[in-house]
Amino acid sequence: YGVPEEPPPVPDTCGHVAEERVTQAFAELTTKLSELQENVTNTFHGCNHCPNGWVTSENKCFHVPLEKASWMVAHGVCARLDSRARLASIDAADQAVVEPLSSEKMWIGLSYDSANDAAVWADDSHSSHRNWYATQPDDESELCVLIKEDQYRQWHDYNCNDRYNFVCEIVLH
């Protein structure tokens, strides 16, 4: 009986099998990633439209609810109508779209920040457009802005607790 021979070398199947598994897992993950990216794109694409009953203007939607509310409550009402909505930030083009939506006074998203001595939009956007009536703003206790119902449809400062119609806005992306 002699010394036993060494067994023949075993092929490196474990490494090969592991490599195949990693390659297959990577391919599956790549496919899943593509599906998820498509779902995200479709989801956001689906949100890039105005809800029924809202007026479309360029990249914005506008709506004047039937109820009247204080300026602050109006914020919440807009958000309940659509999570993307807030009181409207009005520029020159928007003014022409918004005016016919109500024949009554309506809050817009502009208020006076006394701490910074500046008028600010509810969405923190900046616009040089102002449509103040000649004598406005005229009262330091009136910190919120509305479009007046008169023939001029210009802006007036009013007490934020007063209840008026209001215009909500959604900015489409």
From Swiss-Prot:
The record's SUPFAM superfamilies line, in alphabetical order, gives:
C-type lectin-like
Q: Which cysteines are joined by disulfide bonds?
A: 47-61, 78-168, 144-160
A Pfam family name for this chain? Answer: Lectin_C
For this UniProt record, give its keywords in alphabetical order, as a comma-separated list: Calcium, Disulfide bond, Glycoprotein, Lectin
Keyword rRNA processing found: no
GO molecular-function terms, A-Z: carbohydrate binding
Q: Which residue ranges does the record assign to the C-type lectin domain?
A: 51-170
Q: Which residues are glycosylated according to the annotation?
A: 39
Q: Which InterPro entries does this entry report, sorted A to Z?
A: C-type_lectin-like (IPR001304), C-type_lectin-like/link_sf (IPR016186), C-type_lectin_CS (IPR018378), C-type_Lectin_Domain_Fam1 (IPR052309), CTDL_fold (IPR016187)
UniProt tissue specificity: Coelemic fluid.
What this chain does, per the entry, is described as: Sugar-binding protein which recognizes specific carbohydrate structures and agglutinates a variety of animal cells by binding to cell-surface glycoproteins and glycolipids. Calcium-dependent lectin. Invertebrate lectins may be involved in defense functions.
What other facts are recorded? This lectin binds galactose.
> Tell me, how does this one assemble?
Homohexamer; disulfide-linked.
* Protein name per its UniProtKB record: Lectin BRA-2
